[in-house]
């Protein structure tokens, strides 16, 4: 096979399919360890989608900044990942342009250490596409 990338959307579905699992955190730890081994042994790239916990401050749907501590389930998600990217959007903004604009934030970067806002993406409801928009605060 010539598989180069795997997209796993989302981790909680994999965990919920495990028979007899009583401790979600331990199940996520075990699954993350297995996924990490697959990536290391095969060289395949893995995009893993994880849901977030409710934040202490500003809600995510109101544009709250995503952090590693908000990954739901286990610290192993962040510990075993090379890069963690969060998507942030204020779905409640009065301005439809802002409401459909997403910040792509690098939260962890094992390769270079660069973290922070990487770019802004604008959603076009006519095409269903995201397009990068100019942003002076991006590090790229």
Model-derived features with residue positions:
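C-terminal regions of RecA-like/P-loop NTPase motor modules
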Residues: 1-6, 19-22, 33-42, 54-140
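Conserved H-loop
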Residues: 44, 49-51
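Walker B catalytic acidic pair
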Residues: 10
